[in-house]
């Protein structure tokens, strides 16, 4: 079933463009051409999911497979979710706009412990039963999950999924697709199909495994593996080039992975343990993908992604080469994760410049002893050297991440966080420079599966006490902003993160009680109360495993019996030897460190093998000479005025998003745009007037200023080639360089308004229009931006008003004031005047801007 979006995306829906599925890079494959039809479902709002690199890569890979089709969907925002429920409309896939039950398989990204309630919400909105047992009774798509949380411990969510994809999906998902295709052609039953899938390394089918009384997960049949292997793949940067959303996303840039895996061995870090071995991407592949991607997408920023970018030895050379190649295009680079001990002048050069990105480092602990306990591999001297380098290279603020509640932590270690910041501010002062500002995030440590600290227990009460301790220490400290993670979120993460299969009923009940978007600050209290009630109703406590198995505080009671008990994730073969984790835990007790095996000796964790491969570390190539930072070309050689339309679904793209769209279009078209000056140079592109969201137009105007003269027809063709079809170009003309901008010349606008006219004849409309035209004063009270109330005369802003057609709908045309100083006669003002003279409530169906009228 295909969903009619025009009935759903009414004016009350916020940011409707996120539901269109017509972004640049979206794949629209013929439905009939596919044997297997996928939906990649991201259980977060569009702005989060559409910019997730793993989501983009798998979407591109699946659509590259023959006879396979892949669409996307995301968690609808509350307004659309409510509309779906009210209208009994099922959740749909964006590209095909078909309901999710039309597809063969739905894959959810489960990369966060609290994402499960969002998944249940999406299944419910799609009218799909929540558990695999319920779905067995009908004809529903296969439901599976992948991602870090699914790979680390799927047991709390096992009731909801037909299977789990463990590890990297680049090779695994196409293999699953082939089995589905063969199974479909052979008309296999669901159980037969799942049994075939269970033979693929990396596929875990929970129904084929039971939980023993002591908590071990074992097969309930002989033809499935006892332990399920985590899949490992090599990153393919070319698949990172993809979606360019119309709306602004949380990572509104091109992202390319440069290194997968981390061997630093931080004992708290689950991603570092679950993604081994480390695999560097060839520098040439990174450079080629970024250069191609920036030109194909029009982004003005790119990010190099890794768990630790600084451990990619080619980073300075790769970054410098890209910056040099794109020097004249006002491009900036951000590094989301870098080691402070590797931050130097070379890295500063590649991320500095006019659009200097922020710097974020993670010392994690405030004392050397605690950093050794967690095997951070960072000394005070290295920390100071890195921060000093940042100051010397022009940064005046830095973000730092710390954790509290770590194993073996004392109040001295907690206070050490404040003392470290105080020390850094003092030591990093430079003459004639203001002191360095810090933004701190203090997170609460929650133990994760497959780490040496997986046996440890944490205390919410201790989190609260230590947060108060730090608040006292930071009180009055200037230039320091401190953010604390909500302890309720940490409690929910810890409860579910190391749970077993019995928690499925708690997850389900929490969702039924209103949990969802649990980590969003405005939902936290509601979610926490729902989880609390669900836990209580289940006869458990927030510390249910402590109640059953005793205290887990490894630094108080390192009971060997506790360490040898089965864990809910022991049946997953991640490559890390459980005995090695136990030994590393003992090393932590002694604050003994383990070197990084990518650059020093093997730590014998167990990963390096035929199944998982070995570390791939590429030596640092020579760093090219720095060509210098971007210097904005402010030359103004030509001004071009373009008349364009905004029709169809592009009407649902906001004005601010349209501004960003034109910036990217100009970059993709390689038009030599002139830039403004200052610290934040921007392209000289000026849209004459903002059009209301949802309105169409055939008379919009935008001005471009270029650094060199271009033939108008060439300019028109280049622009058209990169614009969406629903942004047609009608006319292009050159205007004098010193001519006023269209924004200043704008005087009037002509609109067509379409009303519901049932029960209203032509004469009535004519009488109402005549009454308005005969009036000299029709006042309306307006509140200014400053809050002042002023009275305006709407009638003096109306120049023309006539009736075009009347049938079941009446079409009116008016010309009114449209100036950028706020003098603007809007369509709803015309509705207000009509309702005054008619004494009736009228229904405006839509409006269209015919043209903008410029003055002399």
What are these regions (language model features)?
Residues 9-39, 46-47, 206, 210-255, ...:
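N-terminal [4Fe-4S]-dependent radical SAM core
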Residues 248-284, 604-617:
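Canonical Radical SAM [4Fe-4S] cluster-binding loop centered on the CxxxCxxC motif
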Residues 40-45, 114, 292-439, 443:
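Conserved SAM/AdoMet-binding glycine-rich loop
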Residues 634-637, 658-660, 770-856:
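Core RNA-modification/binding signature centered on pseudouridine synthases
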Residues 2-27, 34, 38-40, 477-631:
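Radical SAM enzyme core and accessory elements
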């Amino acid at each position: 079933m295909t969903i009619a979006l025009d009935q759903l995306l009414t004016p009350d829906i916020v940011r409707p463009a996120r539901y269109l599925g017509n972004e640049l890079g979206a794949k629209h494959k013929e439905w009939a051409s596919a044997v297997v039809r996928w939906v990649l479902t991201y259980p977060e709002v569009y702005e989060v999911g559409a910019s997730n690199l793993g989501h983009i890569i798998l979407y591109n890979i699946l659509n590259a497979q023959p006879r396979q089709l892949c669409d996307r969907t995301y968690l609808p925002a509350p307004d659309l979710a409510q509309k779906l429920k009210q209208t009994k409309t099922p959740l749909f896939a964006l590209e095909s706009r078909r309901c999710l039950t039309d597809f063969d398989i739905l894959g959810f990204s489960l990369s966060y412990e609290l994402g499960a309630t969002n998944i249940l919400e999406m299944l419910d909105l799609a009218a799909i039963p929540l558990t695999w047992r319920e779905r067995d009774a009908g004809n529903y798509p296969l439901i599976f999950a992948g991602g870090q949380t699914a790979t680390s411990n799927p047991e709390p969510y096992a009731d909801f999924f037909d299977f789990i994809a463990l590890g990297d999906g680049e090779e695994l998902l196409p293999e699953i697709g082939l089995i589905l295709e063969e199974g479909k052609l052979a008309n296999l039953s669901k159980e037969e199909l799942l049994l075939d899938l269970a033979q693929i390394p990396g596929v875990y089918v929970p129904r084929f495994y039971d939980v023993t009384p002591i908590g071990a997960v074992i097969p309930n049949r002989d033809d499935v593996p006892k332990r399920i292997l985590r899949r490992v793949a090599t990153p393919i940067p070319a698949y990172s080039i993809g979606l360019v959303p119309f709306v602004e996303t949380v990572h509104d840039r091109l992202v390319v992975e440069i290194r997968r895996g981390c061997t630093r061995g931080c004992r708290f870090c689950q991603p570092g343990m679950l993604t081994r071995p480390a695999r560097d991407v060839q520098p040439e592949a990174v450079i080629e993908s970024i250069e191609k991607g920036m030109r194909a997408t029009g982004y003005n920023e790119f990010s190099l992604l890794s768990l630790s970018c600084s451990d990619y030895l080619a980073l300075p050379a790769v970054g410098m080469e890209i910056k040099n190649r794109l020097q004249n295009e006002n491009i900036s680079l951000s590094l989301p994760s870098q080691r402070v001990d590797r931050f130097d002048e070379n890295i500063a050069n590649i991320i500095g410049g006019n659009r200097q990105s922020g710097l974020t480092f993670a010392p994690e602990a405030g004392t050397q002893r605690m950093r050794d306990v967690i095997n951070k591999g960072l000394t005070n001297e290295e920390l100071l050297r890195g921060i000093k380098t940042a100051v010397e290279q022009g940064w005046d603020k830095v973000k730092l991440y710390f954790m509290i509640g770590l194993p073996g932590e004392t109040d001295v270690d907690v206070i050490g966080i404040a003392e470290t910041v105080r020390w850094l501010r003092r030591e990093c002062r430079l003459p004639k420079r203001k002191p360095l500002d810090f933004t701190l995030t203090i997170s609460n440590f929650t133990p994760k599966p497959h780490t040496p600290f997986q046996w440890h227990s944490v205390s919410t009460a201790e989190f609260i006490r230590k947060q108060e301790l730090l608040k006292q220490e930071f009180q009055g400290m200037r230039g320091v902003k401190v953010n604390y993670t909500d302890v309720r979120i940490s409690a929910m993460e810890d409860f579910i993160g190391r749970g077993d299969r019995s928690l499925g009923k708690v997850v389900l009940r929490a969702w039924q009680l209103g949990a969802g978007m649990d980590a969003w600050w405005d939902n936290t209290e509601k979610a926490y109360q729902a989880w609390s009630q669900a836990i209580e109703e289940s006869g458990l406590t927030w510390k249910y495993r402590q109640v059953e198995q005793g205290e887990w505080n490894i630094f108080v009671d390192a009971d060997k019996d506790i360490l040898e008990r089965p864990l809910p994730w022991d049946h997953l073969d991640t490559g890390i030897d459980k005995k090695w984790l136990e030994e590393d835990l003992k090393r932590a007790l002694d604050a003994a460190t383990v070197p990084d095996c990518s650059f020093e000796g093997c730590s014998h964790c167990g990963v390096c093998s035929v199944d998982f491969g070995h570390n791939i570390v590429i030596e640092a190539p020579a760093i090219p000479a720095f060509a210098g930072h971007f210097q904005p070309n402010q030359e103004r050689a030509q001004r071009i005025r373009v008349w364009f339309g905004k029709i169809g679904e592009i009407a649902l793209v906001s004005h601010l998003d349209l501004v960003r769209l034109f910036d990217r279009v100009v970059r993709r078209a390689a038009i030599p745009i002139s830039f403004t000056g200052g610290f934040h140079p921007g392209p000289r592109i000026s849209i004459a007037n903002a059009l209301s969201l949802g309105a169409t137009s055939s008379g919009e105007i935008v001005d471009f200023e270029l650094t060199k003269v271009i033939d108008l027809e060439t300019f028109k063709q280049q622009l058209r080639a990169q614009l969406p079809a629903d942004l047609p170009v009608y006319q292009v003309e050159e205007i004098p360089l010193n001519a006023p901008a269209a924004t200043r010349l704008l005087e009037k606008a002509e609109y067509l308004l379409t009303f519901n006219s049932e029960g209203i004849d032509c004469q009535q409309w004519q009488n109402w229009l005549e009454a308005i035209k005969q009036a000299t004063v029709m006042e309306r009270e307006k509140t200014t931006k400053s809050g002042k109330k002023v009275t305006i005369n709407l009638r003096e802003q109306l120049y023309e008003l006539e009736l075009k057609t009347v049938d079941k709908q009446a079409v009116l045309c008016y010309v009114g004031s449209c100036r950028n100083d706020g003098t603007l006669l809007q369509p709803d003002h015309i509705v207000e005047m009509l309702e005054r003279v008619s004494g009736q409530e009228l229904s405006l169906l839509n409006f269209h801007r015919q043209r903008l009228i410029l003055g002399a």
